[in-house]
A protein has these predicted regions:
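Gly/Ala-rich beta-loop-alpha elbow adjacent to hydrolase catalytic centers
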Residues: 20-29
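Active-site nucleophile loop of the alpha/beta-hydrolase fold
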Residues: 44-53
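Short beta-strand/loop motif that positions the catalytic acidic residue
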Residues: 81-82, 86-89
Length: 137
């Protein structure tokens, strides 16, 4: 996480910077963000992991390092959200869990788009045009 902090602050700390993170990469970015002032570039988080998850349907669970840290910081108002950030998560995503992502977004002021009929892989048909629009702004 410290390497991400160092890279962002050394090479990408400007308003024209674009950072795109997917899944666990979003988790790493958010933990790096927790150690910095609000990132001033643009950030797009796709299917972000925001804590631990369990799926009884697939009999799978995952608990990343420090699984409650982001929630704790957000609930206490101590999470410095990026200045310009958007989150997209599939409504059927059992790894990112849309309700958890939406709760995190509400606590941090980060807008969350829930993609209908999509899982953890949002798919090229959705992400391609999203990136085209996002990069054009």
């Amino acid at each position: 996480v410290q390497t991400i902090v160092d890279d962002l602050q050394s090479h990408f700390w400007h308003e024209q910077a674009h950072v795109v993170c997917n899944s666990f990469g979003s988790y790493l970015f958010l933990h790096a963000q927790a150690k910095m002032p609000s990132f001033i570039g643009r950030v797009l988080l796709l299917s972000p992991i925001v804590g631990e998850f369990t799926s009884e349907q697939t009999r799978t669970s995952f608990s990343p390092p420090r699984p409650d840290r982001l929630k704790t910081l957000a609930e206490s108002g101590q999470f410095n959200a990026p200045v310009n950030c958007d989150i997209h998560v599939g409504e059927e995503d059992w790894q990112s869990i849309p309700t958890n992502v939406q709760a995190f977004g509400c606590l941090t002021g980060i807008p969350v788009t829930v993609v209908p009929n999509a899982g953890h892989d949002l798919g090229k048909a959705y992400v391609g045009p999203l990136l085209d629009r996002w990069l054009a702004n």
